[in-house]
Amino acid sequence: MHKAKNCIITCIDFRLQKAYADFIASQGWLGESDLISVAGCSRDLVKPLSDFHKASLLRQIELSIKLHDPDTIIFLDHQDCGGYAQDGTIPQGLELDEDKKQHTAYANKVKKLIHDLFPTREVKVYFAQLEGKVEEL
C-alpha cells in the first residue's frame, strides 16, 4: 500500500486554486496527499442536495482510506462559496466575519460526521479567504 499523509477535499472554484496549492505546499502536503475536488467542498456531507452527492463524496473518501490510508481528512472550504450558495445555505456576498461564522457551524458538523464514520482519522476543516489567507476552523 502507498501511504498518504492526508485526504484533502477542496472546492472546485478556480478563484481558490492558487491559495489551495500554496497552502498545501506550505504545509508540506504537496505530493503526499490524495486530492478530491467537488463543488461546495464539505457541503455535500452536511447539507447535500441529494443522497447521491453525499454518497459520492463519501465513496471518494473511503477509497482514499482503503488505497492510501491517510491519517487526516482535511476539508478546505472558502469564502463566498457558490456551492454552499446554490440553495441559499450560505449566501454569497456576506461580510467575511459572517461568512466564516456560518462556515464554522457547518465545519463542526462535518468534523463530527467524519469522526463518527472514520474514528481512527483526524479531521480538520480550514477556511480560505478570497485573498488567499487560510485558517483552521
What residues fall within each predicted segment?
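Acidic/histidine-rich, metal-coordinating catalytic segments
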Residues: 78
